[in-house]
Amino acid sequence: MPTKSLERLILEFNKLPGVGQKSATRYAFHILNQSEEDVKNFAEALLAVKENVKKCHVCGNYCESDTCNICSDNARDHRIICVVEESKDIMILEKTTKFRGVYHVLNGRLDPLNGITPNELNIKSLLERIAKDDIEEIILATNPNIEGETTAMYLAKLMKNFGIKITKLASGIPMGGNLEFSDTATISRALDDRIEI
């Protein structure tokens, strides 16, 4: 029977996505076997990320200043916005080194069955960016599942009257798949072969 402190640590690890009881227990015992300095560094890293990381006021990506390094980079093409569901999708797309535009993070996808409606997503600021900036193209890089496709179609409909090019990633990422689990070559091809909607 684990101690109360160990039980609490297992419970906290178990709250992480994709971490079951066995993995949580393994992580907790790993922490127990680490040096005090390693555990302290781990705890400090957790606290630092919570204290220092915030959302970019332009795109919604995570950063440690008011504007993320992508939005503040003048070498990027600010006329092309790639719309993603989550900040982690930006990291995946950036690994391809193919996309040189900027991003917009929705903070989720439409999922009415779970109470996620357009009001819960970061859509209003996207429309404001399109209205005030010189935007030429929106790339909808939502995940190829029912919720992602529904979100892409909803956004395409909303943006139709702006008179800009609206594209989405080409196939190659399997239906029901996730950008997170696709390799960089597949994502690069999907960006290169994007289709207008």
Swiss-Prot record:
Q: What is this protein called?
A: Recombination protein RecR
* Keywords, in A-Z order: DNA damage, DNA recombination, DNA repair, Metal-binding, Zinc, Zinc-finger
Does this UniProt record's set of keywords contain Zinc?
yes
Briefly state the protein's biological role: May play a role in DNA repair. It seems to be involved in an RecBC-independent recombinational process of DNA repair. It may act with RecF and RecO.
Supply the InterPro entries for this chain. Answer: DNA_Rcmb_RecR (IPR000093), Rcmb_RecR (IPR023627), Rcmb_RecR_Znf (IPR015967), TOPRIM_dom (IPR006171), TOPRIM_RecR (IPR034137)
Which residues, by range, are in coiled-coil regions?
A: none
Q: Which family does it belong to?
A: Belongs to the RecR family.
UniProt record, GO biological process:
double-strand break repair; recombinational repair
Q: What is the lineage of its organism?
A: Bacteria, Fusobacteriati, Fusobacteriota, Fusobacteriia, Fusobacteriales
Q: Which residues form the Toprim domain?
A: 79-174
GO MF terms listed in the record are: DNA binding; zinc ion binding
- Zinc fingers classed as C4-type: ranges: 56-71
Keyword field contains Endoplasmic reticulum:
no
